[in-house]
Amino acid sequence: MKITVVCGHGLGTSLMMEMSIKNILKEMGVDASVDHVDLGSAKATQSDIFVGTKDIAEQLVIQAVDGKIVALDNMVDKSAMKIRLSVALVELGAL
């Protein structure tokens, strides 16, 4: 399972979300690779799940990335992040 976190420049926002997602996956006992990229690199990235804020997720839909897209309303709301990741993982049969 590969999860890619996407933000505009692939620096601060996506790195913060990557660390949160790694902690959430560890709590859930899910083994997955988690990386972060900028929006421009997302289309060329192979991933099962792409995670981004709502505006980034809209751009991922437009780019037609090949993977499940998880849109977050608030990048610091870990409980919402866990719920949305759980739904995506269940849909992909990883949970």
Write out the residue ranges for each language-model feature.
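Conserved hydrophobic residues forming the short capping helix/wall of the S-adenosyl-L-methionine
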Residues: 21, 25, 60, 89
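Conserved active-site segments centered on acidic
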Residues: 2-38
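Short glycine-/acidic-enriched loop or helix-start segments at secondary-structure transitions
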Residues: 15, 60-62, 81
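Ser/Thr/Gly-rich flexible loops in soluble cytosolic domains mediating phosphotransfer, phosphorylation
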Residues: 68-95
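Short, polar loop motifs at secondary-structure junctions
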Residues: 38-39, 54-58
